[in-house]
Amino acid sequence: MLIHATRRKVTALVASIAATMLAAITMVAGPAVPSAQAQNGNMVIFGDSWVADPPLEQWAAGKLGLDARGSSNVTTWCPTSNNNFGKVAARQLGLAAHDYSCTGTVTISQGPKLASQVNRAIDSRGLNHDTRRVLISVGFNDTYNNDGRPHADVRRDFVNYMRPQVDRIRAHAPNARIQFVGYPQISDGRGNVCLFHVGPNMHDVTPLAKITEWENLGQWMLVDAARATGTQFVDLKPATRNNHMCAPDHLRMWPGVVDFYAGGGNMPFHFTQRGHNYVGGIVARS
């Protein structure tokens, strides 16, 4: 993903940190977006780094303990973008955004757990009777962390993890519509990625079938969770099939590791702001 003014300074760093920051990555028709004053209440947002997508300098300050709030941690606070797709959707719906998403979040792997985000939302009363929407987008980090396990087992374990979390959310936000938001298209769908965009519409094409495998697995994990919990799945794949990391500059929403042509964004190898704005509209209309 792109970075703003600091991107040229961190280009050399991007390749080494991209895999660890890969936190990754559907469209449901719905009513027209109401005006900002049409609804009262809030939206609660849970997810990994593709949701949180904090500015790189804020992410680094949190990791290094240089923020006034101290070191970031999924149990206390996490830096997030003011313009990620969840907040974009909340603004379009006239809802206050309570964003608990955090980079690196996992469910069935070792690491910062989604349950900790739910704990924070309950403890801070972000989840309440006035909550109208709850967005959940997580799971990609669990795909590569469970690489080699049968996909059916990973999907089963993910559903078993998510069921009690959804039950907790429902108990504290009984009036909310809960939505599992799928990941957008990352690879070209044929097992290729484009990591280095070195000139206008000039890039490599690198076979990396694992990315396609992982994004497809993450998609089905979220579909399964929505079905098992009686919640809604928002499918972003159809709406972003032409916006993957090998797409032309004017369409690309998932940038390469080095990419100065897809448009502005925050974290390397994560969604562009254009992508957040686009997906935010889809979620708001869903």
Model-derived segments and spans:
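Secretory targeting and sorting signals
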Residues: 1-37
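Short amphipathic alpha-helices and their capping/turn segments at secondary-structure boundaries
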Residues: 33-45, 114-130, 163-175, 284
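Structural recognition of the beta-strand scaffold that forms the well-ordered cores
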Residues: 42-53, 96-101, 108, 132-137, ...
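A short acidic, glycine-rich active-site loop
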Residues: 65-83, 154-157, 202-216, 268
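Conserved N-terminal glycine/acidic-rich loop preference
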Residues: 126-147, 153-170, 179, 184-233
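Catalytic His-Asp segment of secreted/periplasmic serine-dependent ester chemistry enzymes
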Residues: 186-286
